[in-house]
Amino acid sequence: MALTVNVVGPAPWGFRISGGRDFHTPIIVTKVTERGKAEAADLRPGDIIVAINGESAESMLHAEAQSKIRQSASPLRLQLDRSQTASPGQINGEGSLDMLATRFQGSLRTHHNSQSSQRSACFSPASLSPRPDSPFSTPPPTSPIALSGENVIGCSFQSLTHSPGLAATHHLTYPGQPTSQQAGHSSPSDSTVRVLLHSPGRPSSPRLSSLDLEEDSEVFKMLQENRQGRAAPRQSSSFRLLQEALEAEERGGTPAFVPSSLSPKASLPTSRALATPPKLHTCEKCSVNISNQAVRIQEGRYRHPGCYTCADCGLNLKMRGHFWVGNELYCEKHARQRYSMPGTLSSQA
């Protein structure tokens, strides 16, 4: 449907476009701002812009169309091609609630039709027709296709026919009629489809059509948890050796060797080292054990750093060196005062 829209300005006009000759698509309105100038002029998302101010937009690039719209004077005259299915409540590229509900119902209807076609294919008259010599040659009045709420296992007639183990256990059973075992006609060539009749209110579940459990199903997870719960807890080898050593020690025997860092043999040197305290030096000046830093004066002679001072002035000799005068330590100044001859001094730096 062709129509013309006049958007009263000035810019900005309140809508966005996409497409162009460089995108090989027509120029389409993709978004309309709520309560804007474009919405007031009845411009809608999905409208195809045919001409801008009388100039054809078919051969325009995207940037060229944007520039012409932005630089246009008021009013902006747009010739549009609007689809008949465009919803008037569509805003910013999203449909209204009515349109979304219609699409959702259509998808549900399509899904329901596909399921119905699959069920009718599984239970076609050719696949459900019994053999002439089978006990079900006379079909019951109620057809299994007409029953609602049935859960069907084994839709594929061909796959069950090629499986003798499954063919012997899956038979078409009806209420009030004897089975093939009761009639004495148990053979793998009988009908290989079994229909379980339930209450009409329960819908059919397509997941029951598989004989194998899926790994992500709740039933499979529950079975795995039950198996893990019944399994005996595993004991590590190191814990088992430690338990045997403790039991042997309780019985009064020789404890077994545990090959780990916690074994008695491995911890023996550590215990001896902790039992023997380190040897402490004794300060020769104050006769107190030196527990931290010690100053070694001569072999076997140590002092505290605070006791390593001049005997006359108390100056610390750590950075200056000491001079012996008898058995006392002096600095160089007071040592020279006690002896006039330098040769009598005994110095050590």
UniProtKB/Swiss-Prot annotation:
Record PTM Phosphothreonine, positions in chain: T138, T142
Keywords per UniProt: Cytoplasm, Cytoskeleton, LIM domain, Metal-binding, Phosphoprotein, Zinc
Database matches in SUPFAM superfamilies: Glucocorticoid receptor-like (DNA-binding domain), PDZ domain-like
Regions of compositional bias (Polar residues) in chain numbering: 81-90, 108-121, 176-192, 260-270
Gene Ontology biological process terms, A to Z: actin cytoskeleton organization; heart development; muscle structure development; protein catabolic process
Phosphoserine PTM positions: S124, S127, S129, S134, S137, S143, S163, S199, S204, S205, S209, S210, S263
PROSITE patterns, sorted: LIM_DOMAIN_1 (PS00478), LIM_DOMAIN_2 (PS50023), PDZ (PS50106)
Annotated stretches, region: Disordered: 72-95, 108-147, 168-212, 250-272
Low complexity compositional bias, start-end: 199-211
Tissue: Highly expressed in cornea and lung. Expressed at intermediate level in sclera and combined tissues of the eye irido-corneal angle. Specifically expressed in the corneal epithelial cells but not in other corneal layers.
Primary localization class, coarse: cytoplasm
PDZ domain: residues covered: 1-84
Residue stretches making up the LIM zinc-binding domain: 281-341
One GO cellular component, as annotated: stress fiber
Coiled-coil region(s): none
UniProt-recorded Gene Ontology molecular function terms: actin binding; alpha-actinin binding; filamin binding; metal ion binding; muscle alpha-actinin binding; myosin heavy chain binding; ubiquitin protein ligase binding
InterPro entries, A to Z: PDLI1-4/Zasp-like_mid, PDZ, PDZ-LIM_domain, PDZ_sf, Znf_LIM
Localization: Cytoplasm; Cytoplasm, Cytoskeleton
Pfam families tied to this protein: DUF4749, LIM, PDZ
Keyword Ligase found: no
Record's function text: Probable adapter protein located at the actin cytoskeleton that promotes cell attachment. Necessary for the migratory capacity of epithelial cells. Overexpression enhances cell adhesion to collagen and fibronectin and suppresses anchorage independent growth. May contribute to tumor cell migratory capacity.
Subunit organization: Interacts with alpha-actinins ACTN1 and ACTN4, FLNA and MYH9. Interacts (via LIM zinc-binding domain) with MKRN2.
Name used for this protein in its record: PDZ and LIM domain protein 2
Organism classification: Eukaryota, Metazoa, Chordata, Craniata, Vertebrata
